């Protein structure tokens, strides 16, 4: 397996991740759309201002995520642990990138840009899984 090649393929094909947080030993997970900046190894996602997960980020910025496969029955995925923080970029700064990844996202951005805050996930390693027997940890 060419793990890095598979990492980039999966991270670019998938539209959503399951983002896991934990506060006071109480785990929480939610589905978010994302855009991955390959040049800087940063994953961006946007959420509405005032959502519960934002307060969780301030209390504990350690996160984990897994990509959600696009095809039913497919188990391939990218998993990683990292840190989340508020981005200096706005949703309008990343409008083109998000829109290229998810065509209907441009309408959401245009309607709700003032209500959306961008966050970024930074991570240095990921586990690339093709199936239950084929997986590999990579450094980025």
What are these regions (language model features)?
Residues 1-17:
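Extreme N-terminal tail/first-helix region
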Residues 6-10, 54, 117:
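Short linear motifs in intrinsically disordered
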Residues 9, 35, 108-111:
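Short secondary-structure boundary/capping segments
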Residues 14-49, 57, 63-67, 76-80:
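Short beta-strand segments
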Residues 22-23, 67-69, 107-114:
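A short, aromatic/hydrophobic, helix- or strand-capping loop or linear motif
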Residues 48-51, 60-67, 95-108:
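Short acidic (Asp/Glu) patches
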Residues 51-53, 72, 134-136:
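Short, surface-exposed beta-strand-loop junctions and turns on beta-sheet-rich folds
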Residues 76-140:
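Charged, gly/pro-rich active-site loop segments
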């Amino acid at each position: 397996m060419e793990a890095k090649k598979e990492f980039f393929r999966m991270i670019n094909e998938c539209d959503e991740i399951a983002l896991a947080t934990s506060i006071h030993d109480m785990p929480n997970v939610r589905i978010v759309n994302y855009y991955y900046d390959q040049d800087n190894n940063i994953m961006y996602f946007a959420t509405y201002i005032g959502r519960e997960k934002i307060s969780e980020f301030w209390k504990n910025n350690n996160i984990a995520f897994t990509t959600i496969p696009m095809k039913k029955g497919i188990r391939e995925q990218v998993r990683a642990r990292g840190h989340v923080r508020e981005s200096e970029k706005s949703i309008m700064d990343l409008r083109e990138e998000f829109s290229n990844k998810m065509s209907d996202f441009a309408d959401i951005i245009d309607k709700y840009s003032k209500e959306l805050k961008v966050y970024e996930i930074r991570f240095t390693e990921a586990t690339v899984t093709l199936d239950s027997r084929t997986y590999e940890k990579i450094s980025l």
